[in-house]
Regions:
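Rossmann-like nucleotide/phosphate-binding core characteristic of flavoprotein oxidoreductases
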Residues: 1-4, 16-30, 45-49, 55, ...
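Glycine-rich Rossmann-fold phosphate-binding loop(s) that bind the pyrophosphate
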Residues: 5-9, 148-149
Length: 421
């Protein structure tokens, strides 16, 4: 089996395949990843001040210990290898490629300097090698974050918090340096819909009052109005969200160094500026408002990469319960769209792999030579080489009381992996 994409959906697919192995049937799993490092958004998407979420990486490493598991990192399917070449060399191919691009608002001004998608901004502060050179300018006074989910909250929280709270995390060194120099004092978190439709989760909201250097401001009138508008069948998570926001709204505020303000029901119409972000025009439902801004981050979701040449439906590859076409399957966000938490991918992958297993029981295994000839001109990073990177980063982190100090460039990663550093 070939799995493309070494994020949670890819690893959980490998785990599901391993669970179907028996004395009669053995699944050999090759996991391909375009970066030199696996783990996907667990490495490059989870906020650095949320280390508990990253602990799922221990599960991934246990999955990797299976003798029939191989990692081929630093190999980009679609560039280094074609999808057709994989399909010719494996009994089945599973795409676990996620939805890597930030969704666009589709309004004027999105291409101005210092307007970023959350996909870019989060990858930047998490040390993704493809985003390490972004020229993110934190020298202004106000940042506007547009979105109403946990990613938007992560971005707003990191911009509003005291950077000293990030010193013992695995945030990228360059992002930590920039946040230490940041002049941003006011962060607006702007949601297009009213508070009852926000996709935050209550635990993340409850963390916000712990920001000792930051006043968190939510209108109690807005939250009480949202509570009044709730239908009787509203889910528990919605009520928990509103209760958490109401608790914040009721806090007394002493003057602090920074403010994080929630604004609901404000629809962005235009990002304005002369070559660079200067303000954002919103429709508040009662008229237009112009908010001065020096940085804009849009966090309204992610989009599928259509360069695979596969049909896209909505925001995922067209599929029938995970089957795209004969011997080609899809899991995770690429299957269902960018929804759910890390654990959602486990059940999702298990369902698709069960179907794959049943499909393969009706066929004879392919007699192929393997992919080594296809890889002979490439420089794949295998499991032991990835673990060399991992050990190097963790060892460097121990010197400064951090979980790890990430290598920032593909070259650095390859050099360490190959023992050339």
């Amino acid at each position: 089996m070939a799995i493309v994409g070494a994020g949670p959906a890819g690893y959980f697919s490998a785990q599901a395949l391993q669970s179907f192995s028996s004395e009669k049937t053995t699944f050999k799993v090759d996991l391909f990843e375009k970066l030199p490092t696996p783990w996907g958004l667990v490495r490059s998407g989870v906020a650095p001040d949320h280390p508990k979420i990253k602990s799922v990486s221990k599960v991934f490493e246990k999955i990797s210990d299976d003798p029939n598991f191989r990692l081929f990192a630093n190999v980009e399917v679609g560039q280094d290898l074609s999808l057709e070449e994989l399909k010719s060399n494996y009994d089945a191919v599973v795409l676990a490629v996620g939805t890597p691009s930030g969704k666009k608002l589709g309004i004027p001004g999105e291409n101005l300097a210092n307007c970023w998608s959350s996909a870019e901004f989060v990858s930047w502060y998490n040390g993704h090698p493809e985003y390490s050179k972004l020229n993110i300018d934190l020298s202004g006074k106000r940042a506007v974050v547009i979105g109403a989910g946990n990613v938007a909250m992560d971005v707003a929280r990191l911009l509003a918090m005291n950077s000293s709270n990030l010193e013992n995390t695995d945030i990228s060194d360059y992002a930590l340096d920039e946040l230490k120099k940041s002049q941003i004092k006011n962060v607006w978190l702007c949601a297009r819909r009213t508070a009852e439709f926000a996709s935050f989760t209550a635990p993340e909201l409850r963390e916000l009052p712990e920001l000792e250097d930051t006043s968190v401001i939510i209108s109690s009138k807005e939250i009480e109005g949202a509570m009044d508008r709730l239908h009787s069948d509203a889910g528990r998570h919605v009520r928990a969200n509103l209760e958490a926001m109401h608790a914040i709204a009721c806090l007394s505020h002493r003057e602090k160094n920074k403010t994080l303000e929630f604004h609901f029901g404000v629809v962005p119409k235009e990002i304005r500026g002369n070559g660079k972000v200067e303000s954002v025009l919103f429709d508040s439902g009662q008229g237009e408002i112009v908010v001065e801004a020096d940085l804009v981050v849009t966090a309204i979701g992610y989009e599928i990469d259509s360069e695979w040449g596969l049909r896209v439906e909505g925001n995922h590859f067209e599929n029938s319960d995970g089957l795209i076409e004969d011997n080609l399957y899809v899991v995770g966000w690429a299957k269902r769209g960018p929804t759910g938490v890390i654990g959602t991918n486990k059940s999702d992958s298990a369902e698709v792999i069960k179907r794959l297993f049943l499909d393969l029981t009706k066929k004879d295994p392919k007699q192929v030579q393997g992919i080594h000839k296809l890889l002979e001109n490439l420089s794949p990073i295998n499991l032991s080489e990835w673990r060399r990177i991992n050990e190097f980063e963790v060892a460097n982190g121990m010197k400064s009381n951090r979980p790890r100090v990430k290598l920032m460039t593909t070259k650095e990663m390859v050099d360490v992996a190959k023992g050339q550093s």
